[in-house]
Amino acid sequence: MDFKDYYKILGVEPTADEKAIKAAYRKLARKYHPDVSKERDAEEKFKEANEAYEVLGDAQKRAEFDEIRKYGGQHGRPFQAPPGWESRGGGGGFEGGDFSDFFSSIFGGRSAGGNPFGGARQQQRSAGRRGQDVELELAVFLEETLSKESKQISFQVPQTNAMGQRTGFTTKTLNVRIPAGVTDGERIRLKGQGAPGSGGGANGDLFLTIRMAPHPLFDVEGHDLIITVPLAPWEAALGAKVAVPTLDGKINLTIRPDSQSGQRLRVPGKGLVNKQGARGNLYAQLKVVMPPASDESARELWTKLSEKAAFNPRTQWSK
């Protein structure tokens, strides 16, 4: 198993803030997205970027990674987790995310002694007491909000004896279905899925805080999606049919003649699902991209157009 330095994968410093990490992830995800990149190893690099953001975009996972990084792991070199830091439950982790063995070995489980729950409430140490509630952040990709498949998560819960004394930790694995209409920051309660109670007390609850991962192609506005559609000048001037990605696959979008940068075209029912099960809209925002006049023939064409076209984009200044 090789060490993965998630900072190197995203191309950021270990001191980078959340905004810089998100920006680096979006840049790489956009570059290597299967709908965009033709590079042979694009799919692997896209997966690596997703895995790196899964860790560095989550404060708890990032803190654990920073701790394990202190043991001197070098990117791409053989690595073995230090004593006392062992994966339990067969690696666990976010199996639905297609992440590496390194990810599973670090985040699939830790030996007793640490407390990975941060703000989890302290259980009272007496018989017949309710178990701890567990707080986790769950990274969700836009595509997962449309899928009816479950997402497998693994996390640690403290174990106690009948006297309420902590005896260690165990890894718990659940299959979680992403609710329709889920939004960033939403908190979901899974009753009885937290730590077990002591002395016959009830189990605690599991609280999942949803964190929507940035998408390389789409921005989110409520339950609507925004995608920037680059156009050549002749496509904007003459009209065209353009293949545009959606979460359901590509569609052919009709560009009307005389279209302008900044215009938005609405595609009904291609956004995210709301609480009632209806889909929002996809808005295609047009952006005219100028080709370079890099050779003599291209410059001649632009010169002829400038001579024949009675067009002044600054006419409003002369009023």
Swiss-Prot record:
GO molecular-function term, one example from the UniProt record: bent DNA binding
Any one GO cellular component localisation term in the record: nucleoid
GO biological process: chaperone cofactor-dependent protein refolding; protein refolding
Location of the protein in the cell: Cytoplasm, Nucleoid
Alphabetically ordered keywords of this record: Chaperone, Cytoplasm, DNA-binding
Function recorded in the entry: DNA-binding protein that preferentially recognizes a curved DNA sequence. It is probably a functional analog of DnaJ; displays overlapping activities with DnaJ, but functions under different conditions, probably acting as a molecular chaperone in an adaptive response to environmental stresses other than heat shock. Lacks autonomous chaperone activity; binds native substrates and targets them for recognition by DnaK. Its activity is inhibited by the binding of CbpM.
Protein name: Curved DNA-binding protein
Organism the protein comes from: Pseudomonas putida (strain ATCC 700007 / DSM 6899 / JCM 31910 / BCRC 17059 / LMG 24140 / F1)
